[in-house]
Amino acid sequence: MTTILDELRWRGLLYESSDGLDELLTRERVTLYIGFDPSADSLHIGHLLPLLTLARFQRWGHTPIALAGGGTGLIGDPSGKTQERPLLSKEQVAANVEAIKGQLAQFLDFNAGDHSALLLNNADWLTRLSLMDFLRDVGKHLTVNYMLAKDSVRSRMTSETGISFTEFSYMLLQAYDFAYLFEHYGCKLQAGGSDQWGNITAGIELIRRTLGQKAYGLVYPLVTKADGTKFGKTESGAVWLDPKRTSPYRFYQFWYNVDDADVGKYLRYFTWLSADEIEELERITASQPERRTAQQRLAREVTRMVHGETALARAEEASQALFGGSLARLSAGDVIDIFEDVPSTTLPRQDFEGDGFPLIDVLLRCGIATSKSDARRTIEGGGIYVNNIQCPDVGRRLTLNDSIDGQFIVLRKGRKQYHLVKVG
């Protein structure tokens, strides 16, 4: 491989790029930027591709700029949207920018000498731009005809909801960002998802018209799933990078449950593994799909990258719990995550105090056994587990010492029938 573009090509990440970009990257190291929309107080897995694109460029010796959209976030990007989004307050956008800065920073190296990463906020220049200056210095150079030809605008023009002047002007603001970064930071390249191509080329045109210079664009494909459903969404919503919003366990499980048809592509997109390593994992998936070797590697790589080694270890321990693994090191929060969807029964705390609650009675109260004799037979037959430890003692009494953080006891009948006892 001679340039970063060669790596992006074999990973399937080069959707479209400006003419001459190959030659530029062959002869010089460049500064590039990608913008991040602060529409929430956390990034989600849909942001991993842009984050990793910046990181990949930096590993090739280029200088990445992560641009938080504190200014453009006040307007809202119409690209890929079928209707206008509600405007966030200035205070909310500013708070979101501060919240995502740390997530942006963890993927980039800010102490890499002459190609150290930069973290900027376009509110620093957009909020100082007067209306008159904007109309004279930006609006003058891009015709309405030019803007209407862009997919992000044209698709909205033909919809019932249309497009407001506010969102229509977003393209000009993003173009101004590119021109500003070109002039003040020597930024020659903007990257983004394929739905950003129109906005990126508008910036290239503005730079050509106002500065008489050549700039470049590059877009990667939008992430898709083989079954046609939206990537990054689960039944409970988006998969966030913030562990308070999506726990490391659920984050790990998202990647572990990726379909066989998608896992090879996602290994290329979201990890640093080599082509040889990925091809070997694909061969294993083709011959022994039940092992889920590729999915496990994907889950490990991405969880480690986002949450760190300690969180990965806890996520893997938690993942084993549903397959009979030890619960000894799990917290109450882990239990809620893992057993959220299993049947549960709340029993009074006082019943577990003193000598404790007879296991036979607990099984009856939870509906795991239909009668005391049924409970006794199941226990004696080795079919009952307390916190995944087999319990063949019919005289066993459960106490608070059996509970996890004083809140939960996990019962299991046979191999798969779980029941969560909540200590009330």
Swiss-Prot record:
Query: Gene3D superfamilies recorded for this chain?
Result: HUPs (3.40.50.620), RNA-binding S4 domain (3.10.290.10), Tyrosyl-Transfer RNA Synthetase (1.10.240.10)
Q: Which residues bind ATP?
A: 233
Q: Give the enzyme's main class according to its UniProt record, as a single word.
A: ligase
GO annotations under biological process?
A: tyrosyl-tRNA aminoacylation
> EC annotation?
6.1.1.1
Keywords of this entry:
Aminoacyl-tRNA synthetase, ATP-binding, Cytoplasm, Ligase, Nucleotide-binding, Protein biosynthesis, RNA-binding
In the UniProt record, does the keyword Protein biosynthesis occur? Answer: yes
Record's keyword annotation contains Protease: no
GO terms (molecular function) for this protein are:
ATP binding; RNA binding; tyrosine-tRNA ligase activity
Just give the chief location class: cytoplasm
Q: Where found in the cell?
A: Cytoplasm
Q: Which NCBIfam families does the UniProt entry name for this protein? A: tyrS (TIGR00234)
Describe the subunit structure: Homodimer.
PANTHER family given in the database record: TYROSINE--TRNA LIGASE, MITOCHONDRIAL (PTHR11766:SF0), TYROSYL-TRNA SYNTHETASE (PTHR11766)
Say which family it is in.
Belongs to the class-I aminoacyl-tRNA synthetase family. TyrS type 1 subfamily.
Functional summary from the UniProt entry: Catalyzes the attachment of tyrosine to tRNA(Tyr) in a two-step reaction: tyrosine is first activated by ATP to form Tyr-AMP and then transferred to the acceptor end of tRNA(Tyr).
What is the protein name for this chain?
Tyrosine--tRNA ligase
Gene name of the record: tyrS
